Each structure stands twice: as structure tokens, then as C-alpha cells.
Amino acid sequence: MVVVVAAAMAAASLCCGVAAYLYYVLWLAPERLRAHLRRQGIGGPTPSFPYGNLADMRSHAAAAAGGKATGEGRQEGDIVHDYRQAVFPFYENWRKQYGPVFTYSVGNMVFLHVSRPDIVRELSLCVSLDLGKSSYMKATHQPLFGEGILKSNGNAWAHQRKLIAPEFFPDKVKGMVDLMVDSAQVLVSSWEDRIDRSGGNALDLMIDDDIRAYSADVISRTCFGSSYVKGKQIFDMIRELQKTVSTKKQNLLAEMTGLSFLFPKASGRAAWRLNGRVRALILDLVGENGEEDGGNLLSAMLRSARGGGGGGGEVAAAAEDFVVDNCKNIYFAGYESTAVTAAWCLMLLALHPEWQDRVRDEVQAACCGGGGRSPDFPALQKMKNLTMVIQETLRLYPAGAVVSRQALRELSLGGVRVPRGVNIYVPVSTLHLDAELWGGGAGAAEFDPARFADARPPLHAYLPFGAGARTCLGQTFAMAELKVLLSLVLCRFEVALSPEYVHSPAHKLIVEAEHGVRLVLKKVRSKCDWAGFD
């Protein structure tokens, strides 16, 4: 009897302890953060236990999906570039209700949503390592990014950036342009061959996969010393891993309380299986290049990983993790986002043939002035209209729709005291489409590259490559890659929207065309007979 009573008391004590822990984690701790912000006059929707404002977010999303908040259309007149209400309806509705600074919660995670330029300015100027990436998002995206540069914090992040950044300095990028041209010529020639085989002068096709192949080939050649053929499996699996991570169903309560290991989901297991296969393929690539100094990013990472000395099994495993995680990060950042931006750019040029003609004339003048040579780095720098088109594309369709940070200690931004643990969300699309910030002849939601002709963009309201110390280190590389592709495509083709194109931006870690970008390509005779074409 005594044993039974003792067991019952122990069970009751355990239940009380678990209940107290859950109450603290799910309500008390986040409520303290919310109270800290409320005392500063920062409002927001009222959260409920235990999921915060998640039910409201789902309700707003369902209403937007049912009403098609921005037009999904097949005709040019139906295309609306302001996708905020369709993709992020909860943010837009709350911003209109509570102003440019408000707070909301997802489970026990407290978010400070900021679209006030003065606060964004201070965030951009903050170089403290105590402003990092969200611990929750880091855990959620672990199979895709691991401990690589995109999600790491503190000294680990600083070390990785110091190692990787020099590989994307302008002097390095100059030497990569010829490889980019080679990859672009393969793509353009394949499109010409398909048109010739069709027996006509034009072709209606979905361009997304072909552009991803180009972007993947560029990354493989320039950063890892291999061809796309060799790395195709890695790219395909990373794409599949991205889809799995962005759509996998979370057991939110388990994630919030640190008990997710007790409630594994099938989608989570699938992500980790894919991660294992990606890891094995990358290590095979490392093995092939392990004894070589190719002067590329992979070689630099291998040198850094081996710099720790001999060590035991744990050291070797850590070195492998370092190389694998950063390879995945570079593959994703340099491959997916650039390919999506190129697709959006061609879609916008198809909608605006006057800009297409301007860019084509400019490219031919820049390259044919050098005797018809293929574009090199100096020629790319002369392409001002093309630069403006890319800048405007990145304004309307930034790959990263949100800049997210977590306060790893209490910070002050724009007069707002941000307590430790609060996640700061800056909606890039909101800043990029703000009518007050982007005034002038064309509306903020209209395509007008000329807005970049003479004036600098509004300070701290144009964030296509992120903000602050964590600004994308590969932006010079990405701009060169985009210019090479677009210049070669436009010198060989006129592009128009296909009647089958359906405009529907969607957020899948980055903002991309949900149904792909479908164009009609018509061959034109270029004034520049670049090697590899004729």
C-alpha cells in the first residue's frame, strides 16, 4: 500500500512539474516579453493559449486564398505586382490595424514586426553578434542549412563569413565571368535547337528548370570546380529538400517545448533522409577534390576545415559538418534565389517590350563595340539599363521577402527596447512597395526601372540582399550571373508572355512563381556573333 501511495504521489508530482514547465514555456515567458513591448505602446493582436496568433494567421490566409487577394491572371492587364495581401494577408491586415510596428505571437515565439525605416536603419547599422538568426527557424530548417553561414550565429557565423566573403569579392568575380558565359551559351543554344526542331521561329516553354540548370552549372563550375552534370543529383535533392522543409508539418507544441524528438513527423523524417543523401553526395565531391587546390570556394573551405590539426573522430566529424553545411548553404543561396530572380526578370521584360528593346540595344552596343566579343566584366558594368531592370525586379520580387533577426540580448532600435528572445521581422516587400517611399511618376507597384536612373533608392527601404552585417556576401556574383544570362538571352530572343502563363507569387522560403514562368521565345538575329553560337 505504501508503495502504491508513493508511486501515486510521485506521478502527481511529475504531472505538476510538467504542467508548471509547460505553463512557463508556453505562456508566462512569452507574456513577459509581450508586456515589455506593450509598456512601450506597441500593440498587436491578442494571442491565445497555447498557439498565440496562429489561428488568426490561418484565418487570414484562408480568406485571402478564397478571395484571390491579388489577381491570378492569364492576361497582362490581370497581373498585379503587389502580392502582399495574397501572400502575407495577416501581416498586411495587422499593419493596417496597428501601424508599422506591432507584435504578434506564434506559440511561445514573440515577433516584433517592423516596417518603419528609422528602425530598419538602426537594425542595418547594428554589427553586434547579439543580433542573430532565430533559434526556432534555425531548428526548423536544420536539415537544409545545418550550422552553415545562413543560419549560424555569433563567432561561428563571423568565422564562416570571414572565410567565404573573399571568394565573392569583385576581383574574384571578374575571373568567373567567362565560366558564366559558357554556361549561358549552353542554355541559349539549347533553346535555339528546340526552336529549330519545332520547325518554326518561336517556342512556348516553361523556363524555370532551364534557368535553374544554368544557375546550378555556374555555382558548380565557379565555387566547386565541377560541372552541372556531376552536381545534378545534389541540386535536385536540395530542391526537393527545400520543398520538404517549407511544407513539412510541425508539431508546434512539441517544437516549442523542446520535446519534438518525442513526436517525430513523417515529413520531418523524410527531410532528414534527404539530408543524409545530400551529405553523402557532397562528401563524394569533397573526396574527388580533396587533394587538389582548385583556387575555389570548396578548396578554401577544405583548407579551413583541415586547419584545426589532426584531432580525433569528433574533430573530423566537425570538419565534415562545416564543409557539408556551407556547401548546402552556398548551393541554395547561389542557385535557387538567382534562378528565381532571373525568371521574374524575364517575365517583367516580356510584359514591357520597350525595356526589352532598350536592354537589347545596350547589350549589343557594349559587346559589339569590342569586336563582337562575349560580355566580360567591364562590358557588364556598362549595361546601365540592364542594371536598372534587375534592380527594379528585385524591388518588386525580392527573393527574401522578410529580413529576420533575433535579439540574443536586450537591444535598443529606434527608441524601442527589444528584450532578449524577441524575433524581429522586417517585411521587405512592404518597404519596397511603400507609396510614400517610392513616389514619382509610376506607382510603387508598377514596373519602372527608370526610378533607379538618377536617384539612389530610399535609404534603408531597399533591401534586396538583406540588411546590416548579414547582407548577402554574394551580391556582386549574383548581379554578374544575372547580367550574363539576360544579355545572352535578349541578344538571341524576343520574349513574350505565354497565353498559358498564370501569375501567382508564392512564398516557399523565397518568393517564386507558384505555377512557373511560361514564355514565348522568338529568335532574333543578333549583331554580335559570339563564339559558341555560329
Swiss-Prot record:
Residues 1 are lumenal. Its EC number is 1.14.-.-. One of its GO terms (molecular function) is iron ion binding. It is a single-pass type III membrane protein. Heme binds at residue 472. Residues 23-534 are cytoplasmic. One of its GO terms (biological process) is lipid metabolic process. One of its GO terms (cellular component) is membrane. It is an enzyme of class 1 (oxidoreductase). The chain crosses the membrane at residues 2-22. SUPFAM superfamilies: Cytochrome P450 (SSF48264). Highly expressed in spikelet and uppermost internode. Detected in shoots, roots, leaves and anthers. Its main location: membrane. It holds the Pfam family p450. Keywords: Heme, Iron, Membrane, Metal-binding, Monooxygenase, Oxidoreductase, Signal-anchor, Transmembrane, Transmembrane helix. Induction: Up-regulated by bioactive gibberellins. Belongs to the cytochrome P450 family. Catalyzes the 13-hydroxylation of gibberellins (GAs). Determines the ratio of GA4 and GA1. Converts GA12 into GA53. Overexpression of CYP714B1 in a heterologous system causes semi-dwarfism and increased 13-OH GAs content. This is Cytochrome P450 714B1. It comes from Oryza sativa subsp. japonica.
